[in-house]
């Protein structure tokens, strides 16, 4: 999963022509690690229609603050440079897929 930073967030996420799912997490966060396979599967199933990236909240303070990320994991789908869906806490692959489906079907 590609990592983004405060410095690259605008180019990698906000300027993307396809939706981008951002996992706000941290290396010490076990639930963050637990959801990564589900997010990777969603990205693989929707290849070319979505990207999944992660942002380390310990190393990048500005972006989580901008989007009111108060706990990890927080997963936000951005489309057209705007946050469209937010899920806080760990969820099942099916919950992520259901929530993000309207943005991945074209």
Question: For each of these PLM feature ranges, what is it?
Answer:
Residues 2-20, 61:
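A short beta-strand-turn-helix
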Residues 5, 25, 51-53:
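Conserved Rossmann-like nucleotide-binding pocket used by diverse enzymes
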Residues 17-18, 24-28, 71:
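Short pre-active-site segment immediately N-terminal to redox-active cysteine/selenocysteine motifs
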Residues 21-22, 52, 75:
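Hydrophobic beta-strand anchors of alpha/beta hydrolase catalytic cores
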Residues 29-32, 75:
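The canonical Cys-X-X-Cys-His
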Residues 31-46:
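Typically the conserved alpha-helix immediately C-terminal to a functionally engaged Cys/Sec
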Residues 57-63:
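Structural microenvironment flanking redox-active thiols in thiol-disulfide oxidoreductases
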Residues 71, 76-106:
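Non-catalytic, surface beta->alpha helical segment in thiol-disulfide oxidoreductase systems
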């Amino acid at each position: 999963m590609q990592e983004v930073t405060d410095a690259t967030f605008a180019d990698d996420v906000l300027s993307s022509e396809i939706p981008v799912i951002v996992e706000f997490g941290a290396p010490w966060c076990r639930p963050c690690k637990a959801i990564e396979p589900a997010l990777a599967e969603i990205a693989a199933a929707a290849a070319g229609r979505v990207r999944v990236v992660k942002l380390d909240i310990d190393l990048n303070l500005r972006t989580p603050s901008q989007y009111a990320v108060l706990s990890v994991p927080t997963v936000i789908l951005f489309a057209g440079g705007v946050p469209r869906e937010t899920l806080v806490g760990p969820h099942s692959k099916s919950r992520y897929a259901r929530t993000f489906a309207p943005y991945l079907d074209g």
